[in-house]
Amino acid sequence: MKSEIIKVKTKSKNYEVHIGNNLISKLRNIIKKNKLSFSKCLIVIDSKIPKKFRTILLRNLNDQKIFTLNFNANEKNKSNLSIDKIHNVLFKNNFYREDCIISFGGGITGDVVGYAASTYKRGIKFINIPSTLLAQVDSSIGGKTGINNKFGKNLVGSFYQPDLVISDINLLRTLPKREIICGYAEILKSSLIDSKKNFVFLDKNFNKILNLKGNFIINAILNSCLLKKKIIEKDEKEKNLRKSLNLGHTFAHAYEASLGYSKKLNHGEAVIFGL
């Protein structure tokens, strides 16, 4: 199975997005090649991540002093309280801006950790390791971070680009089919924005992509990421062009809100209805 590297260049930061299989076992080398140096690292780990992947990740970061924090990723915990918990670990252990925080989880985890990274001493190094298909094709790239409040979803946040993104296909193999379909919704959205060629590719290889077959899933993720790269490099702060990436999301957010952001309807499923 091939691996791909996308180089994202924005006004605020340049970084690489790595897409492939068993990448977390190569994390030490990827960090070195990207010339990312830090002496301390906090890994915020989604509680749903299987233990075997946690072990692999920690084994590949033994050059640094490592701290971990478990995070129960849900909309309720996408809050200021979670930000405070992360910041408290960083302050108590005297993290500097040159140190690093890693998000190891899905989109909610990435949004929360990214916002914590952007607000700790006005910005600390941030590595995103998305563990869901939806996060790999969408939220892990582009720098949108945020939390919810009583007035709505994602209303408090920042634009803060990561220093590195690692999208490991192996992480997807433990997910339920429902989660894969949620990610496919964002892939479908990207194809509708991008080109007939990508849409036809999805239509032709639907089952292979849902079953995470070899280069088919790699190419599906790659195409979505390349579209997002192209758009955010022209419009990082969503002044105009980037708004096109919200296709299907107006109704999607309304559907989610009407159900109180319950597990009855996941975000990707809401996007399908929105489309």
Report each predicted region and the residues it spans.
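Glycine-rich beta-strand-to-loop/alpha-helix junction loops that act as flexible
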Residues: 74, 104-106, 247-248
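Residue-level signal for inorganic ion chemistry
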Residues: 20, 43, 79, 130, ...
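A glycine/threonine-rich phosphate-anchoring loop and its flanking beta-alpha core
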Residues: 9, 114-207
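Short glycine/serine/threonine-rich phosphate/pyrophosphate-binding segments
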Residues: 108-114, 136, 254
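Active-site segments that bind and position negatively charged phosphate/pyrophosphate groups
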Residues: 205-275
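ATP/NTP phosphate-donor binding region
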Residues: 1-100
